[in-house]
A protein has these predicted regions:
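Gram-negative/organellar outer-membrane beta-barrel architecture
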Residues: 1-171
Length: 171
């Protein structure tokens, strides 16, 4: 199409968005029982490239749930922000004499500290409660109680690629 000036042209571009989400389900069985899992994942939540993932797994003696999110460009800073929360409840009181509840929270980010040197700090917080009965092993009885753990994790990454997706130069 011609523009308002002979040197200008109007270009019309039609963009068709592809599906960015997934739904998954699975089931299995074995000598220790059966398992059923269900998950939902979205790779472009709110059209901003935010990845959201949730999973729920059931087995004969346990239930596990997790919700995680990764924002690759948090507040337009070119720094990512990732969070995850999960909980696992296992009940083996009848067979092995113990019951465990574990809750976890994780928070992390990444940013370029110096040219091509990236810093990835994160903090993980875990709380576990272990209950036993006289049927439990001696080692499990010694571990009975509440545990709180905090871990600071970091990674340094030196990246000389010319681009992250399909690089043609660098390492």
């Amino acid at each position: 199409l011609d523009g308002s000036n002979p040197n200008l042209k109007i270009i019309e571009i039609e963009v068709e968005e592809k599906a960015t989400g997934e739904i998954s389900a699975g089931a299995g069985f074995g000598t220790s029982g059966s398992t059923f899992g269900f998950g939902i994942r979205e790779n472009n939540y709110l059209g901003q490239g935010i990845k959201v993932n949730t999973n729920l797994t059931f087995s004969n003696n346990s239930v596990k749930g997790e919700l995680s999110m990764n924002n690759p460009n948090f507040k337009n800073s070119n720094n990512s922000l990732s969070t995850s929360i999960s909980s696992t409840s296992s009940d083996f009181l009848a067979d092995y004499g113990y019951k465990s509840n574990l809750s976890s929270l994780s928070l992390g980010t990444n940013f370029e500290r110096y040219e091509d040197l990236f810093f990835y700090p994160s903090i993980d917080i875990n709380y576990e409660k272990l209950e036993t009965t006289p049927k439990a092993s001696t080692n499990l009885k010694k571990q009975e109680g509440d545990y709180f753990e905090t871990a600071f994790i970091y990674t340094l990454n030196y990246d000389k690629r010319n681009q992250r997706f399909q690089p043609t130069e660098g390492f």
